[in-house]
Amino acid sequence: MNRLNIAVSCLATALLFGCEALHPPAPGDNPDYAPTYPVTPDPKELRKVSGAIYSSETALPLFETPRARHPGDILTVYLIEKTDAQKNATTTQRKNDTTKITNKLFLGRPISLGSGYSMDFDLDNQRQFNGEGRSIQNNKLAGSISVTVAKVLANGNMVVQGEKWVRINQGNEFVRLSGIVRPQDIKADNTITSDRIANARISYGGTGQINNTNAQGWLSRILWGPLFPT
């Protein structure tokens, strides 16, 4: 009975590892990429009469470019990510040991084990190991995404974040981005390239049937899980 319980427990654990799947991402499920909206002024504050015509809450800039600078402002990011990585490794180890003993003498006299026997022997040991590895990886991501300013730091830099979802046929494609932007790097048309964003976090993926075809099945996940280490 104990063996049966152990077998059932092991099978249940294996099924859990095999059936384990990450919840597919969905729009708005991650607050790190949620949009930030401008702060709406209190109507009571707007109704206060100070005697001046100018009001900072309703002011519109007339002589400055429409660049993002306040929380809730929109900034367009052009994605120009490209990485090329290549690594080669070659290892060779070789060792040869040879030992030969002849003319055995003890106290100046030859040693004999009798007729038909000899104490002469040769020992030859050879070991060799050859290893070679090569890895090549190329990645490229191009496109654009509009994000919002989430926070303005003390030095004037801005934390931006956002996501874009596009439904194509039976699946969804998404791009998520967050990072820190310098106001000086924003162009006059309120755009910036992704290579100018510090601490950038860029994610591209998809959901749906087409994306699921690239994932392993439950049996493959069991065989490649921690219960069957390679």
Curated annotation (Swiss-Prot):
Record-linked InterPro entries: Flag_Lring
Signal peptide: 1-18
Pfam family, one: FlgH
Lipidation (S-diacylglycerol cysteine): 19
GO biological process: bacterial-type flagellum-dependent cell motility
A GO cellular component entry from the record: bacterial-type flagellum basal body, distal rod, L ring
GO molecular function terms noted in the UniProt entry: cytoskeletal motor activity
Compartment(s) of residence: Cell outer membrane; Bacterial flagellum basal body
Keyword terms, alphabetized: Bacterial flagellum, Cell outer membrane, Lipoprotein, Membrane, Palmitate, Signal
Top-rank taxon, per record: Bacteria
Residues with a covalently attached lipid (N-palmitoyl cysteine): 19
Oligomer status and interactors: The basal body constitutes a major portion of the flagellar organelle and consists of four rings (L,P,S, and M) mounted on a central rod.
NCBIfam families registered for this protein in UniProt: PRK00249.1-4, PRK12701.1
Job description of the protein: Assembles around the rod to form the L-ring and probably protects the motor/basal body from shearing forces during rotation.
Assigned protein family: Belongs to the FlgH family.
Matching PANTHER family: FLAGELLAR L-RING PROTEIN
Protein name per UniProt: Flagellar L-ring protein
Name of the gene: flgH
